[in-house]
């Protein structure tokens, strides 16, 4: 009877299921039992190539936030398109098509750097249960440009890029002639002045994105909020 009760206990007792973390590193899949640290995930690939760590990006493949943000942005764009003149409506249509075509996943705000993670425990967190995509790249040579334009393009990345000169040369008509949004490769969002009188040149991280935004009025923050929402959404782009 005692053995029967023990057997019954083991059958009915809740089972502890080992945590499982799946990480696709570029195109190679790794499965970890338990919750690995960043160094555990990077060790199999860290020395394979000369990775440019600042442009590395970690995404959750089982997240839903990015797609929700996309729906909200597209809804706002439809409203603006309906209320705009023909020229702006056409530009909005092009932006909608760009946003609809993006491959998105929820970006994890985490610095990816193998050497830093080995030296500083604060940069070597454990992965929560789930499915991830980790993109590692050698040093990119281009900057992606998207936004209110029929011609999204790429610019060659250079030291001390003079964005005002390059963008006005590439795009004769800009909805916002004063500033652009810069989504750095490390997911930091900033604005940069591009007025004709702006002669400032600065460093743009390889693999960054430039968003050509709506005009922003000092009397209303509607466009500013939408511009930031689009830039924030672009952080979640999966750019192979």
Can you describe what each PLM-predicted range is?
Residues 4-12:
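Sec-dependent N-terminal signal peptides
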Residues 17-240:
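Ser/Thr/Pro/Gly-biased, low-complexity, turn-/loop-rich segments
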